[in-house]
Amino acid sequence: WKALILGTRMAAQEYNATIEIKAPTEENDVERQNELLKEAIEEGPDAILISPSSFTESNKILDEAKEKGIRISFIDSYTEEPVQDLTVATNNLEAGEKLGKFAASLLGPDDQIAIVAHVKGVSTAVEREEGFRKGLGDLADNIVDVVYCDSQYEKSRKLTIELMEKYPNLKMVAG
């Protein structure tokens, strides 16, 4: 996110635009993101750049922004309602599928697999897992667990250790 913020500030300076950055401390804090989104809408900006932390929970608020003529740009994730004017994102289905195909080339027919994903319910995590399962093909049935680390390194480390203890025959942890 640091690179995105730096790039946004540079572009704002180049185009003589004013920006204000509002973000929750934790990526999975949907409630706080929605509070900040409401605050931003009340300030009446020309545009809002957002990476929605929920596929569903911000829809009504974003609809309000659209009704007020505020342009909406999504970064790397989106909501179930297509309210955005622009989306800049990774093709998460394709990325997940490529990882799944690579993983399948390393695994045997009975090898157990676990997934440590970033934030439950966010479109990027959903699509990456879907693509990964597709890439695995028949080996997708070997996925024994999916856990979420909320984009926190230490939590992902702890969850991975717990998975390895819970499934002693685990051959791969994908994330």
Where does each model-flagged region fall?
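A residue-level marker of the well-folded mature domains of exported/periplasmic proteins
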Residues: 1-175
